[in-house]
Design a protein with these regions (language model features):
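Active-site nucleotide/adenylate-binding loops and adjacent lid/helix of ATP-dependent enzymes
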Residues: 80, 92-180, 184
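Conserved N-proximal alpha/beta basic substrate-recognition cap immediately N-terminal to
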Residues: 7-117
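Hydrophobic residue at the +6 position relative to the catalytic HRD Asp in the kinase catalytic loop
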Residues: 259-261
Length: 301
């Protein structure tokens, strides 16, 4: 039986264990963060406490490079296995600005976006804001789950948000000192499309409850209270959405990918991508999803 190292013990790991076991793949969660890892030890030591032995029995393949890149690099070196979505895939998707730059270069539709690399003069920020019709979305380049994303209705609010980002970026250990300024699409519907090897295998629409909308919420992240409902992508949006998402996966060359679409009456745009997407309930995927995922895992060996 193939041994799969899974760098998470959350929903994805819980949901994949039984379906993959039925397909000859044994999964085991590995902890790569918030622990100590011996990277070098004296000869003749306990092998279970050194090298790859610290992660349990030997593995054949890993499922998605670990979320913390530094510790993930240590685990990668010690485990010496191929990954479904390696380090380069994670980096290509994690940097929102880079993702949108590659997609835009390929002619795919994306929101109007400016990447700001701190520090910059206030005059630069004023020029950036002047290029948009307010309000504008301000988001850190590398965060997930809607963390740090804000809406600026006017110039003073925009500059105030940028001031807070300056405080964060002033800390010398901050690796990514960039952020995005984007157009706001207030009435857009929000979809997450899942792809395996460039093929759509499922989609959900993320909606906020009426109470949340009434309270002024606008972010559609599930971790922020949105509800995800499985949809048939072609029935909901037609062939254009499928074509756009599959083209995005091809451009980014990421085999296991979530693509976030914003859809208005006249536009379908790729807003973000996620190379570490959570596996949802099986009912939200097309038939054959688990077979496709098992095939992708085996293809890495």
């Amino acid at each position: 039986m193939l041994r799969l190292a899974v760098a998470t013990n959350a929903e994805t790991y819980e949901r994949m264990q039984a379906p993959l076991a039925d397909r000859g793949i044994e999964t085991d969660a590995i902890e790569t963060a918030e622990r100590s890892i011996h990277v070098a030890a004296a000869a003749g030591g306990d092998s279970s406490q050194n090298g790859a032995g610290q992660f349990g029995e030997a593995f054949d393949v890993g499922f998605v490079f670990p979320p913390r890149l530094a510790e993930g690099g240590v685990a990668d070196a010690l485990l010496d296995v191929p990954w479904v979505n390696d380090r380069e895939c994670i980096l290509r998707s994690r940097g929102k600005g880079e993702t949108l730059a590659w997609l835009s270069r390929a002619g795919l539709p994306t929101p109007e976006t400016v990447v700001v690399s701190n520090p910059v003069d206030e005059s630069v920020l004023k020029d950036v804001f002047a290029g948009f019709e307010p309000p504008v979305v301000v988001k850190p380049n590398s965060t997930t789950r809607g963390v740090g994303v804000a809406l600026a209705e006017d110039l003073d609010s925009f500059l105030g948000i940028c001031d807070y980002l300056d405080l964060v970026h002033d800390y010398r250990a901050t690796g990514d000192q960039s952020f995005l300024v984007q157009e706001f699409l207030p009435d857009a519907r929000d979809f997450r499309v899942m792809l395996i090897d460039g093929k759509v295998v499922g989609a959900v629409e993320r909606r906020l409850p009426e109470a949340a909308l009434a309270a002024g919420q606008w972010k559609h992240n599930v971790h922020r209270g949105a509800e995800a409902t499985g949809v048939d992508l072609d029935e909901e949006l037609g062939e254009e959405a499928r074509a756009v998402t599959e083209a995005a996966a091809e451009v980014l060359d990421i085999p296991w990918l979530g693509v976030d679409l914003l859809v208005t009456d006249d536009r379908v745009v790729v807003n973000e991508t996620n190379a570490r997407p959570t596996i949802d309930e099986a009912t939200k995927y097309e038939s054959g999803f688990w077979d496709d995922l098992a095939s992708l895992i085996r293809a890495q060996v």
